[in-house]
């Protein structure tokens, strides 16, 4: 197997999963955290900056109440209460491992999808780093609802890496890396030392999660890697239960899987549109419109739209797809200039007919190319 070196970096986000923070559902434990802390301390001594994204608040809350066991199947109020109980315990646990100030940063999905709040979070983390403080980030489960949750800290870590302008994302889990198949089921499965691009083939390799407390599985790790690499951030998946892997990482070696940054990273605004802004609906377009979006850098015109789905307003994000032989493929995502009701009236029509149908024409396009992110 080819040797892969860890790319040079100056600022990293290190994500630590529940399986490492609270192994065997016993609440917070240092069993797997000492090597991670050693990596963070060593990196800081080398003049590098590190941000931690730590799961484990709900698991800590369960253990504090003497319940332990799986954290699955909890209602939203139960999860919120247990997170409120466990988050201080989680922070205290981390503080014992470091001799530098640690700052708690709790984020919600709303903080990530609203651009102004995204920038506020970015500025807060930048200020903490300037003050030589170790930011420790978690999702604010105490106020998050099912509809407004990131849902897993793999993807949260990717969002944090983007807003913090990190150049490395390290996902510490209980797996050795990405395999060609589930190694528990397939003895011929091989670990991939590096992934150059995250394609449908890569997603096909991903198996389901079997974690008890954790909400993420291998799929969420690949999703997180895609978010990060799309913005030019190298991403590493390592086994945090094997202390030697973290020590190797500290030496610049690559014991897990490296997801290499995209050759052409997305600009900040388009990355936010694609990965953070929720889609409120979907527009299906004809093959000609799809080709124009993909290959000509065109705006989406009403003439190319064949179907409108969802209830959305002007300024909302919508997915744009093309259907061929019964299969629907996403082409792009963008911010629409027209709501769903108006689009149902003007779909398939030429731009000059918009005013005739609606009595007004705010724009002669539905999605401007500057507000459009085309899928690779």
Swiss-Prot record:
**Alphabetical list of Gene3D superfamilies matching this protein:** Acetylglutamate kinase-like, PUA domain
Task: Return the Pfam families for the record.
Answer: AA_kinase (PF00696), PUA (PF01472)
The pathway entry for this protein reads as: Amino-acid biosynthesis; L-proline biosynthesis; L-glutamate 5-semialdehyde from L-glutamate: step 1/2
Catalyzed reactions per annotation? L-glutamate + ATP = L-glutamyl 5-phosphate + ADP
**Gene Ontology molecular function, alphabetical:** ATP binding; glutamate 5-kinase activity; RNA binding
Name the keywords, alphabetized: Amino-acid biosynthesis, ATP-binding, Cytoplasm, Kinase, Nucleotide-binding, Proline biosynthesis, Transferase
* UniProt-annotated location(s): Cytoplasm
Which enzyme class? transferase
Q: What does this protein do?
A: Catalyzes the transfer of a phosphate group to glutamate to form L-glutamate 5-phosphate.
Q: What is this protein called?
A: Glutamate 5-kinase
Biological classification of the source: Bacteria, Pseudomonadati, Rhodothermota, Rhodothermia, Rhodothermales
* GN (gene name): proB
């Amino acid at each position: 197997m080819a040797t892969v070196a860890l790319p040079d970096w100056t600022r990293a986000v290190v994500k630590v999963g529940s399986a490492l923070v609270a192994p065997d559902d016993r609440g917070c434990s240092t069993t797997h955290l000492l090597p991670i802390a050693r990596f963070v301390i060593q990196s800081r001594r080398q003049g590098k900056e590190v941000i931690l994204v730590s799961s484990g608040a709900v698991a800590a809350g369960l253990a504090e109440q003497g319940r332990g066991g799986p954290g699955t199947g909890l209602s939203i109020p139960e999860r919120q209460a247990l997170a409120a109980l466990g988050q201080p315990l989680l922070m205290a646990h981390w503080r014992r491992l470091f001799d530098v100030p640690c700052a708690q940063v709790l984020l919600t999905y709303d903080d990530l999808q609203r651009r102004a709040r995204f920038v506020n979070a970015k500025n807060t983390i930048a200020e903490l780093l300037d003050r030589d403080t170790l930011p420790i980030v978690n999702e604010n489960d105490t106020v998050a609802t099912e509809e407004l949750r990131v849902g897993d800290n793999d993807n949260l870590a990717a969002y944090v890496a983007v807003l913090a302008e990190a150049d490395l994302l390290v996902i510490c889990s209980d797996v050795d890396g990405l395999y060609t198949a589930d190694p528990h089921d397939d003895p011929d499965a091989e670990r991939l030392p590096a992934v150059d691009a995250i394609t449908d083939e890569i997603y096909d390799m991903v198996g389901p999660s079997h974690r008890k407390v954790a909400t993420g599985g291998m799929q969420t790790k690949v999703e997180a890697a895609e978010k990060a690499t799309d913005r030019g951030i190298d991403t590493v998946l390592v086994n945090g239960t094997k202390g030697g892997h973290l020590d190797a990482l500290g030496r610049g070696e690559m014991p897990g899987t490296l997801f290499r940054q995209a050759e052409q990273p997305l600009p900040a605004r388009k990355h936010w549109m694609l990965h953070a802004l929720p889609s409120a609906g979907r527009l299906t377009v004809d093959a000609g419109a799809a080709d124009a979006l993909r290959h000509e850098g065109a705006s989406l015109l009403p003439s190319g739209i064949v179907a409108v789905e969802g209830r959305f307003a002007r300024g909302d994000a919508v997915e744009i797809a093309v259907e061929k032989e019964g299969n629907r493929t996403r082409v792009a995502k963008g911010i629409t200039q027209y709501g769903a009701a108006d689009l149902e009236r003007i779909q398939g029509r030429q731009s000059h007919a918009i005013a005739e149908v609606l009595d007004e024409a705010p724009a002669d396009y539905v999605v401007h190319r500057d507000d459009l992110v085309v899928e690779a």
